[in-house]
Amino acid sequence: MYSVAFKMLVGDRAKYFGIIMGLTFAALLITQQSSIFIGLMTRTFGFITDTSQPDIWVMDPKVQFVDDIKPLQDTELLRVRGVDGIEWAMPLYKGLIRARLENGNFQQCNVVGIDDATMIGGPPEMVEGSLSDLRRADGVIVDEVGARTRLARMPRDQAGNPIPGAAPVPLKIGDALELNDKRAVVVGICRVGRTFQSQPVIYTTYTRATTFAPRERKLLSFILVKAKPGQDIGELSRRIEVNTGLRAMEKWDFSVKTYQYFMKYTGIPINFGIAVALGFLVGTAIAGQTFYNFTLDNLRHFGALKAMGASNMRLLGMILFQALIVGLIGYGLGVGLASCFGLLAGRTELSFRLLWQTLAVTGGAITFICMLSATISLVKVMRLEPAIVFKG
């Protein structure tokens, strides 16, 4: 009977491909938009992910997310270091500073100042140079994307004049730029995770970063804390908060707090939610209507099977089998196309992160569409009179 159901399904090629196209479109749009949304929201706490050494981030109690900088006094670092259970506590500067390029243009940059001695808080991966090169005079490390795009230099001829229409030359080791009217020399190129902000990322020492920054009474952005071996991190966080009055959060908790801020105060979830819902509704409409029309066109065949003694349960199994076939094909094609899209977008600025949970949600959505389509068709078949096969 299942072979008969399969032959009925593929017999009408137009409706067969129509059902598959509807399910493929739904699976593609749900998977693609969900993966872009997840990738975009992951970027909101990308800086926390890149800074992997500390267990705890200490900050002003009013900080809402990682880029909401509310500076502390430098004396707070000593207070935190005095708390029992801490292996080390290091300062971190993070702020936007204007860079003056070779052509006279200005570019806002994310400047990160890390501990001068230990270099804790540095970039996750060095492409050129060494992290210790930051100890050189005026040394900075630039992320590779910023070096080849927004901080790139215009090529010049032998007379020193810019060459019109020529491709920009990526910033390289030895090149100089100005940060807040102070000289900085590139001593390394690093690779960092993409963040929600699009500005180039520049690493330097904490002391040098505070000289680049505009003069303020408070310049300490965060305190990075590592717990002693065997120390409960949650308990240490509470101890820091009690002793200092500051907010102390584990890495994951700080990431979640940042993620929740963007979920609550931006329109990103609504925009992507509408796109996913649209894909689901369009897929349901196309697949459901086409599958129902397919069933109507085959009522005489179902009636003949019923006249030959096929039970309603057997007919139900045939319809569910047909729904399973088109569901698996549509799901596979949709997810496959979304995965190819993700591979092509991997080296672009587009965020795309495909998780197994996304595949599960897409599978559940396609299953629901197939079951709904099969149920609508099943009602017609269950009410079918075998005598219809003998009419006109």
Language-model segments: residues:
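Transmembrane alpha-helical interface segments in multi-pass membrane proteins
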Residues: 279, 300-346, 361, 365, ...
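Basic-flanked hydrophobic alpha-helices used for secretion and membrane insertion
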Residues: 124, 151-249
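Peri-transmembrane interface segments
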Residues: 36, 44, 190-193, 236-285, ...
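N-terminal Sec/SRP start-transfer signal
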Residues: 1-31, 41, 46-47, 320, ...
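C-terminal membrane-exit region of the final transmembrane helix in multipass inner-membrane proteins
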Residues: 358-392
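Hydrophobic alpha-helical transmembrane segments
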Residues: 16-20, 336, 356-364
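Hydrophobic, regular-secondary-structure patches
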Residues: 24, 28-110, 128-131, 136, ...
